[in-house]
Amino acid sequence: MKSIAGIFLFGILLGSTGGVVAGDATAGKDKSAACTGCHGVNGISSNPMWPNLAGQQEGYLVKQLHAFRDGVREDPLMTPMAKTLSDADIDNLAAYYNNLQAGQ
């Protein structure tokens, strides 16, 4: 019985690390210049049409950028922007925006 509980706990712990992203926030900052027109210099958008990126979860940003890039999610502005991003670019941008303080 103890071994079954141990295996179950191990599976839960293993599954909880699925959202870990190994991006480079410094490289993400360099790449973020193209994002600032809509999402703001510090990831805080001045227009309510575009979401704030500052403080956003890395895994969420990675998933959404992949969806835009791969055509799963479409937007007239984001889809062409995301199509230029490599997997490393996406990870780096996600790390950068996750490290910024979320807006008010």
Residue map of PLM features:
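Classic N-terminal secretory signal peptides
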Residues: 2-20
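C-terminal capping alpha-helices of c-type cytochrome domains
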Residues: 8-11, 64, 83-104
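Electrostatic cytochrome c docking/interface patches
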Residues: 15-32, 46-49, 62, 67, ...
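Extracytoplasmic/secreted proteins, especially bacterial periplasmic and envelope-associated proteins
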Residues: 27, 60, 77-80, 92
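The canonical Cys-X-X-Cys-His
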Residues: 35-41, 93
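Generic structural signal for alpha-helix termini and adjacent loop/cap motifs
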Residues: 41, 70-71, 100-103
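Gly/Gly-Pro-rich "capping" loops immediately C-terminal to redox-active cysteine motifs
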Residues: 43-72, 79-83
